[in-house]
Amino acid sequence: MSKTFIIEAVMLAVHGQLMLPGQPVTYIIPYTSIQELYELQAGSEPIMLEEEDDGFVKQMIGELITFFEESFNKKKIEKALVAPWRKSPPLPINENVTLMVVLAIDTEAYGEHFDPIETELILSSMKEQAPILTDQFDLIERLIQAEIPVQAFDVEDFEFAVEGDNQV
């Protein structure tokens, strides 16, 4: 059975190990985080501290954008964009990784403490009963402080999250 995680699209470009799990994983990605990939690719600000790493991550972002723009995948994503909280059909990446895109809606429910994409991650996690996977330790801290009823894992704990019985 596949483990499900809620994640921003850029995490897949930054953390290559997420594309090579030891068992089947499904990543649910809010559509707005896919749109953010275009901004990150076009932006002049570095994403990573090291120039070499930054170039590699920007290349991976380009590959993700190309994947999402492939005709067949684009049609699947467009099916999710017809109604709030609708998910795309599965977009297989490899034998162990499947992506699904969700048209998450920021209801401003957590706008005081979280930005719009973080709010979409939270609401998607609640709706899907799946943990958030992030590299933003401050996000995890704010989730705890605000007593948001979701589970979140740091990317560094990815293998533990995949292996354990951690569904919300």
What is each residue range found by the language model?
Residues 4-128, 137-145, 151-152, 156-162:
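Active-site-proximal, substrate-binding regions of enzyme catalytic domains
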